[in-house]
A protein has these predicted regions:
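Acidic loop->beta-strand submotif enriched in PP2C/PPM serine/threonine phosphatases
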Residues: 5-9, 40-79
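A generic local secondary-structure boundary/capping motif
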Residues: 10-11, 20, 54-58, 117-122, ...
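Non-transmembrane, aqueous-exposed alpha-helical and coiled segments at domain scale
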Residues: 137-167, 176, 180-305
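Catalytic core of PPM/PP2C metal-dependent serine/threonine phosphatase domains
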Residues: 1-36, 53, 106-133
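Active-site glycine-rich loop that binds ribose-phosphate moieties when present
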Residues: 45-56, 113-114, 149-156
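PP2C/PPM family metal-dependent serine/threonine protein phosphatase catalytic domain
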Residues: 28-57, 210-216, 222, 230-235
Length: 305
């Protein structure tokens, strides 16, 4: 063995939400997608201690996607499905073919790494790392669950909830009634069960999504915990139309800032000792979900009433 220390690296910095600064050494060149097409960004070279460093600085645009990778990605398929491996250009073509403006950075990385794993036939011959960053505008989401502990606080809670900018999600039957009275709009119920385990969603004019409460949020929490692990269930909630899946997609992929409005009123049904532990006090459920969302990099604010 040569016993020589060796390291490749890719550094991507976003400066003042205006400029991208990329520094690269011996990794495949970072792929940048702009408006779904390959963006040929400027590159300068700098030699340090005999090593050539590539450096780039350029203005960013909303929805720019940065895809950095180790050389294991280029070696995927060598001697198996592909004679010369999966080249950077081929990886860029694959990313473009699978590009959707709404795709999160995580989903884009998963799409590419899954294809690498397929080309390696599940037996990677080299370290294979994909890192993705996406430039986006902030997207606030506001979620209210449970009525206030004191009924006289209903209007105050609703005033604060509807004063917030962003998507509005209402969880729980009693909460929906409070919102319905406040907006003077009827609740339009649905009997469409997209998932037999999740109660159907409803419609209230002025609200983006109306769902059942604890059962639905318990499922969202399960999805969140899985998402932070191996995201094996992401293929379920990404396409399903039940309340838990719709909330998961909004919170995990779309939201940047999430405001929870949590009523402290206790629903006696949730105190049934025969129900699983996830059906305990809703504050515990929301706290656990908020912790997961913080680990996803979301900005969280909890308000109790």
């Amino acid at each position: 063995m040569r016993q020589v220390a060796y390291s490749t690296f890719t550094i991507i910095r976003i400066l003042d939400n205006k400029m991208a600064h990329i520094i690269q050494f011996d990794n495949p060149a970072t792929i940048v997608l702009r408006r779904g097409e390959l963006f040929d960004y400027p590159k300068l070279t700098r030699v340090i201690s005999g090593k050539t460093i590539w450096e780039s600085t350029f203005p960013i645009e909303v929805d720019d996607v940065f895809i950095a990778m180790s050389d294991g990605a280029e070696y995927a398929g060598v001697g198996q499905e592909l004679n010369f491996g999966w080249t950077r250009d081929s990886i860029a073509d694959y990313a473009i073919a699978n590009y959707l403006p709404e795709n999160s950075a995580k989903s884009t990385a998963s799409i590419i790494i899954d294809e690498c794993n397929r080309l390696y036939e599940g037996r990677p011959g080299d370290d294979t790392t994909i890192a993705v960053a996406r430039v986006r505008n902030r997207h606030p989401v506001n979620l209210v669950v449970g009525p206030p502990e004191h009924k006289e606080d209903d209007v105050r809670m609703m005033n604060l909830f509807f004063a917030k900018e962003g998507t509005k999600i209402v969880c729980g039957g009693t909460t929906s009634n409070v919102v319905s009275r406040y907006l003077h709009q009827p609740i339009i119920a649905s009997l469409d069960y997209h998932d037999p385990e999740i109660p159907p969603i409803s419609q209230i004019k002025g609200v983006d999504l109306t769902t059942e409460g604890v059962i639905t949020l318990a499922k969202v929490l399960a999805y969140a915990e899985d998402f932070l692990d191996q995201a094996k269930l992401a293929s379920v909630w990404a396409v399903q139309k039940d309340g838990a899946s719709l909330i998961a997609k909004e919170l995990f992929e779309n939201a940047t800032d999430i405001n929870f409005f949590v009523g402290r009123a206790i629903n006696p049904a949730h105190q049934n000792p025969n129900l699983p532990i996830t059906f305990g006090i809703k504050q515990q459920l929301i706290t656990s979900l908020a912790d997961c969302l913080k680990r996803m990099g979301k900005h969280i604010r909890l308000s109790y009433f």
